[in-house]
Design a protein with these regions (language model features):
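Active-site beta3 strand of CheY-like receiver
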Residues: 52-58
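C-terminal output helix
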Residues: 94, 112-121
Length: 127
């Protein structure tokens, strides 16, 4: 997968799976992103968003404790201009619709290596 690098952007990766976080970090770093932080739960994501204020958040939907959708809701309540991309191995239309209604800017499915990430990041950063 050869994608053109973008201008630098800071990102927060939220996933309870270390493997999934590493995969996202690798892809996003390859296209010009700088890791602002990692979170393993929804609660952790909300706190880290408040402290780090990244340009983009990549949030898993299903996590123990606070789900990604609830963390998205809390982040959007904190900052209505937050740019959150939901990530899941589940392609459930109801979850996608709910995430978009609550303010998610995009939705991608795992594995992230098969996603046109530079195009998605460019789109989300421009809106």
């Amino acid at each position: 997968m050869q994608e053109k690098a973008l201008e630098t952007f800071k990102f927060l990766v939220v996933d309870d799976s270390e493997f999934a976080r590493r995969a996202l970090i690798k892809v996003l770093s390859h296209i010009g992103g700088t890791l602002a932080g990692e979170a393993v739960s929804g609660q952790d994501a909300v706190q880290k968003y408040k402290n780090l204020r990244p340009d983009l958040v990549f949030m898993d939907i299903t996590m123990p404790g606070m789900e990604g959708i609830d963390a998205l809701d809390a982040i959007m309540h904190e900052d209505g201009a937050a740019r959150v991309v939901m990530v899941s191995s589940l392609g459930h239309n109801d979850l996608v619709k709910d995430a978009l209604k609550k303010g998610a800017k995009h939705f991608i499915t795992k594995p992230v290596q098969n996603v046109p990430m530079a195009e998605i990041v460019r789109f989300v950063l421009s809106h």
